Swiss-Prot record:
Top-level taxon of the source organism: Archaea
This protein's record includes keyword Ribonucleoprotein: yes
Coiled coil stretches, renumbered: none
A GO CC term assigned to this protein in UniProt: ribosome
Organism expressing this protein natively: Methanococcoides burtonii (strain DSM 6242 / NBRC 107633 / OCM 468 / ACE-M)
GO BP annotation list: translation
General function of this protein: One of the primary rRNA binding proteins, this protein initially binds near the 5'-end of the 23S rRNA. It is important during the early stages of 50S assembly. It makes multiple contacts with different domains of the 23S rRNA in the assembled 50S subunit and ribosome.
Subunit record text: Part of the 50S ribosomal subunit.
The protein's name: Large ribosomal subunit protein uL4
One Pfam family hit: Ribosomal_L4
InterPro entries reported in the protein's UniProt record: Ribosomal_uL4, Ribosomal_uL4_dom_sf, Ribosomal_uL4_euk/arc_CS, Ribosomal_uL4_euk/arch, Ribosomall_uL4-arc
Amino acid sequence: MTTANIIDLSGNSKGEIALPEVFSEIFRPDLIKKAVLSAQANRLQPYGTKLYAGMQTSAHSWGSGRGVAQVPRISNGSRVARIPQAVGGRRAHPPKTETDRTEKINKKEKRLAVRSAIAATIDADLVKARGHKFTAEVPFVADDAIEGLVKIKEVISFLQAAGLYDDIIRAKEGKHIRAGKGKRRGRKYKNRKSVLIVTGEESLLSKAANNLPGVDVATVTALNAELLAPGTHAGRLTVWTQSAITNMEGMFL
C-alpha cells in the first residue's frame, strides 16, 4: 500500500497517510483521452447557418442557346448568384443545428479513466512531462487546515512553503494571445493550467485561490477526467487534502 507524507501550512511533515487503492490503478492514456474529448464534445453549443443565407436574390438562368453556362445570373448583369460555386452563394452542405455532435463513453470506461487519471497525479515522471515545476516530492497531501484559508495571500504562502509556487509563476508567464480568429471571438488568450487542489468538501478555499493563474479547486466528489488531465494529458500537479483522501475510499469503482 502506498503512503504519503502529510504537510502542514508551513510545509513541514506532520505524519503519514495510506493512499486508497485507486492510486494504484494502471495508466490508461487512451481512456483518459476518450473521457476528456467526450466531456468537451458534450458541452458544444449547436450551430448552423441562417436558413436563407445566399438565397436572397432574384437571379435566374438565361436558359440555352447563348453559349454560356445555364446558371442563375442577376437580372441586370451576367454575374452568377445563389449556387454554391458562386461568390456570395449558399453553401452546398452547411452545418445544421440538429446534428448530433455528442460523443458517448461507457460508464465503466469513464470511471476507469478517472481512476487512471487520479493514479497519474502521484507519478512524478508524468507530472514533470506535463511541464509542471515543483521542488517537493509527489504525492502532495495537505493538512485539512488548508480548507480554512480565506485569503489569497494565505494560499500563496502555503504554496511557497510546499514548493509549488514555481508552477503558478509558470502558468502566469505562459499566458499568451491565441493564434487565429478565436482571438476576436471572446477567447483572446490561451492560459496554462497549474495546481489542482482537491478538498473533502466545499470550502472558502475555492474563492481564496480563484485568482491564482491556472489553479482549480474541486471537491473529491466533483473530480472528472478533464480536471485531472487537462488537454487529455494526465499527470496534473495535484494537492490532496487529508479529508479528500479519506473520503475517496471506495469511490470511482
